[in-house]
Amino acid sequence: MQKIFNFFPLSVYKSKLSLTENEKKEMIEEVRSMEKKSKNLDYKSASKAWTGDTQGFEYLHNNPKFKNLFIQINNCILEYLDSLSVNHKKLDLYFQRSWATISKKTEHIDNHSHDQSHLSIAFYLRKQ
């Protein structure tokens, strides 16, 4: 069930996705594998979270193991645009970049912006 929160001029769309436990497990294993294959280990300090976009893994949407996730996200985007009365049939929608992050207890992700994107999405595969 989706919800929209309006914080003028920002609208936030929240929804639950229906991924199976096996799908989630497979994606978590894939992210852990990416972490082990990191290409830029000097970038990560003890207080910073691992971010796939800095390690050569910035195109999750092209990874077959994440296919169903991105199909569902795309459907949510269409619902969000419909709720704003935006005719998405007149738009070309595409995923530009997508990556996983791993944040351990004392780690954080620095403040940042996604200025190149019209929409930004966060999905929590596993939250502890």
Residue spans of the language-model regions?
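Non-heme Fe(II)/2-oxoglutarate
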Residues: 1-87, 108
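Catalytic core of non-heme Fe(II) oxygenases with the double-stranded beta-helix
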Residues: 86, 94-128
